[in-house]
Curated annotation (Swiss-Prot):
Keyword Disulfide bond among UniProt keywords: yes
Residue pairs linked by disulfide bridges in the UniProt entry: 88-91
A GO MF label: thioredoxin-disulfide reductase (NADPH) activity
Keywords tagged on the record: Disulfide bond, Redox-active center, Signal
UniProt signal peptide: 1-22
Entry's Gene Ontology cellular component terms: endoplasmic reticulum membrane
Stated name of the protein: Putative esophageal gland cell secretory protein 6
Organism: Heterodera glycines
Pfam families: Rdx (PF10262)
Gene assigned in the entry: HSP6
GO biological process assignments: cell redox homeostasis
Length: 244
């Protein structure tokens, strides 16, 4: 096998290994999501006793509830601001967002919740787009059996000649190799939570996602501040971000 092609394969292997390691680092905070993994199997241990009263009563099929001074849900103010989640889609955080949205709607009926992808930097975005276009162009050339190098006045490299002789394997290798690079450029590891334009939690700064009680407290704190009751709660720095 040609030396240059061997070098190419080594680079592809190293890049793939780097991607695996990078994804592992980005998913270090995934342990924080494990509190939702058994939500359907054993929800009684995921929240406080007050928040779980409704779940327990439904499981026991009790039709008559005993009087309790604790309400199961929070009555939203008329001007309740929307809650926005900005997360890394390529990191697999969409399911976590959907689980957070579900428990928020259960505690705050009628709350407006939005989710969107946390955009990477401009350079990363442009780089991923360029790699995507180059990937498509190279795969088309390989599948069609045509070399673009003579058109550019260049001699076709040996490794590209091998790719033309092994079209299926080369196209698959190009696809996987370019996708690995695109994934590295687009992955941010973000899971940010906002109320209106104010960020109440940042995984990028805290290194983890909030537990449901922490998120409830952050929202209640924000609502209390809007009502002028900030003195009863901690600042936003208690919820994973600095007060600045």
């Amino acid at each position: 096998m040609d030396r240059r092609f061997t070098v190419f394969l080594v680079i592809a292997l190293v890049t793939s290994i780097y991607e695996v390691l990078s994804n592992g680092n980005l998913n270090d905070g995934d342990d924080s999501f494990k509190q939702f993994d058994e939500l359907e199997e054993n929800p009684a241990h995921k929240y406080s006793k007050e928040a779980q009263k409704g779940f327990e009563m439904e499981e026991e099929e009790v039709t008559i509830r005993e009087p309790s001074g604790t309400k199961e849900s929070f009555k939203l103010p008329i001007n309740m601001p929307p809650v926005k989640f900005s997360f890394c889609v390529s990191c697999g955080y969409r399911q976590a967002y959907e689980q957070f949205a579900q428990i928020l709607r259960e505690k705050y009926p009628g709350i407006d919740i939005h989710g969107e992808n946390y955009p990477p930097g401009i350079l990363r975005t442009v780089g991923a787009q360029v790699i995507g276009m180059v990937k498509i162009a190279l795969i088309v050339c390989v599948v069609s059996g045509r070399s673009p190098f003579p058109t550019l006045g260049l001699e076709t490299p040996t490794f590209f000649q091998w790719m033309l002789s092994n079209r299926l394997s080369a196209a698959l290798m190009l696809f996987l190799f370019s996708n690995a690079i695109e994934g590295m450029l687009q992955s941010t590891g973000a899971f940010e939570i906002y109320i209106e334009s104010e960020r109440i939690w940042s995984k990028l700064e805290s290194g983890r996602v909030p537990s449901p009680p922490e998120l409830f407290q952050a929202i209640d704190s924000h609502l209390a501040i809007r009502r002028g009751g900030a003195g009863r709660f901690g600042s936003s720095s208690s919820f994973g971000i600095d007060g600045s």
